[in-house]
């Protein structure tokens, strides 16, 4: 056990990661040494930032807490704290079931942890925040919460209403990170395009991204988690006209069958969705679309699923993820629908839709062979440098593998000629 060391473990999404990074910054400003997701827990204090999105994520968070409770009982750690989405939603139950945790915090009051440890009463995250990602990219969370009430989604229950961060606060954070060496920014929110609505009733995401793009030193900006309904199309002008805004957009569509879209409370139709995709393709040629689909939602018929498969073949998404429906307590679907699609059918549909997408992705990546793409180097693994193009977000998208025949700098950009591809990745040589 290392005195003065705090080990922070983050479960779940990149929005949780940003919260962990902010907490690490506060700890370090008050004299602690922090590690993140260390393979070996050695700190006297451990903080688990939990996920409460779906059942598997909840169980993973609980299992992690229980492992650390055992470590505490064995004297390997002194203090154990829990924060994040799971404890935001189930704090009382967790306190009753796992009382060995020193204290539970929610998603928004984790700064109180410093006060409880006898540190400054109102700590502030001044200066560039600690980042746990490679030094050249960072996630920027522009809002909290969500006003969308999808029938299946527990996130609004956990995070509350949408609250936009002040624009100048976001811009200042990015300036500080640029000064510390960050070049690439992943702009994230539960609903990106809703930014500003809670401030004056208008969507200001296009203006915000344009202002970020104008900051000297910002090389790449990538946009995650938009929504098709009431999409602000002026954002496409910014993506098309600003060279440092990546031609990449992450929009969760979930389904295409009007039956499913209605039951899911998506407030968009099949026809509107297809028109939306066609307009994006037309207004920003070459843009790569990432989406997420949901199979096995209550009431999904074989016809609904076949319609979804045909839609995937038509849309030819460059990037796509999918997951099987999991009933979440407190949601509209859990309270009003019977979870009537058998688990084996959900899995079969999930496997099928991903197999269709894998073939599409392989064809799209193969078409890049022979082209020269600007690539940022993320790391070196064995005999290869691993990089990404503007069309690839960290962790979730294909990578570019470059044989390490010469020394390349991590965080630097290179023009890479693509020489080969497989089902997942590209291979290339520096020009």
Each language-model region and where it sits:
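Proteins enriched for Cys/Gly/acidic motifs involved in redox and nucleic-acid/cofactor modification
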Residues: 1-195, 234, 245, 249, ...
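Conserved strand-turn element in the central/C-terminal portion of the radical SAM core barrel
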Residues: 11, 149, 153-160, 220-229, ...
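Conserved glycine-rich "GG(E/T)P / GGGxP" loop and the immediately following alpha-helix
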Residues: 52-57, 182-211, 215, 227-234, ...
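Conserved, mostly hydrophobic/aromatic
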Residues: 150, 170, 187, 223, ...
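Radical SAM/AdoMet-radical enzyme domain recognition
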Residues: 179, 206, 214-215, 220, ...
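Short, electropositive alpha-helical surface patch
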Residues: 200-213, 233-247, 300-318, 342-348, ...
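Terminal RNA-binding accessory module
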Residues: 333-431
């Amino acid at each position: 056990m290392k005195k003065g060391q705090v080990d922070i473990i983050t479960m779940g999404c990149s929005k949780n990661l940003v919260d962990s990074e902010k907490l690490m910054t506060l700890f370090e400003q008050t004299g602690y040494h922090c590690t993140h997701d260390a393979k070996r827990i050695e700190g006297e204090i451990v903080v688990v930032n939990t996920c409460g999105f779906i059942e598997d994520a909840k169980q993973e968070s609980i299992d992690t807490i229980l492992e650390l409770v055992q470590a505490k009982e064995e004297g390997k750690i002194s203090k154990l704290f829990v924060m994040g989405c799971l404890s935001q939603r189930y704090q009382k139950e967790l306190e009753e079931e796992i009382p060995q945790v020193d204290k539970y915090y929610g998603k928004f009051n984790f700064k109180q942890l410093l006060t409880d440890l006898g540190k400054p009463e109102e700590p502030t995250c001044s200066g560039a925040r600690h980042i746990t990602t490679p030094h050249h990219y960072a996630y920027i969370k522009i809002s909290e919460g969500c006003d969308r009430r999808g029938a299946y989604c527990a996130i609004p229950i956990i995070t509350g209403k949408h609250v936009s961060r002040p624009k100048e606060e976001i811009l200042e954070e990015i300036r500080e990170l640029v000064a510390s060496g960050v070049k690439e920014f992943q702009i994230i929110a539960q609903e990106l395009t809703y930014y500003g609505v809670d401030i004056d009733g208008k969507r200001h995401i296009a203006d915000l991204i344009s202002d970020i793009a104008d900051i000297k030193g910002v090389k790449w900006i990538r946009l995650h988690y938009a929504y098709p309904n009431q999409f602000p199309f002026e954002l496409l002008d910014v993506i098309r006209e600003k060279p440092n805004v990546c031609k990449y957009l992450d929009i969760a569509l979930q389904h295409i069958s009007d039956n499913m879209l209605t039951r899911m409370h998506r407030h968009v139709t099949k026809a509107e969705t297809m028109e939306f995709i066609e307009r994006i393709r037309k207004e920003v040629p070459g843009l790569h679309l990432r989406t997420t689909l949901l199979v096995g939602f209550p009431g999904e018929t074989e016809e609904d699923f076949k319609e979804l498969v045909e839609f995937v073949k038509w849309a030819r998404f460059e990037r796509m993820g999918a997951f099987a429906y999991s009933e979440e307590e407190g949601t509209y679907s859990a309270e009003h629908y019977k979870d009537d699609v058998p688990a084996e059918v959900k899995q079969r549909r999930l496997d099928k839709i991903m197999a269709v997408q894998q073939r599409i992705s392989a064809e799209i990546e193969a078409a890049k062979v022979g082209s020269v793409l600007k690539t940022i180097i993320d790391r070196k693994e064995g005999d290869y440098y691993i990089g990404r193009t503007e069309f690839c977000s960290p962790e979730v998208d294909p990578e570019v593998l470059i044989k390490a025949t010469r020394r390349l700098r991590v965080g630097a950009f290179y023009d890479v000629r693509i020489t080969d591809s497989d089902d997942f990745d590209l291979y290339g040589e520096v020009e």
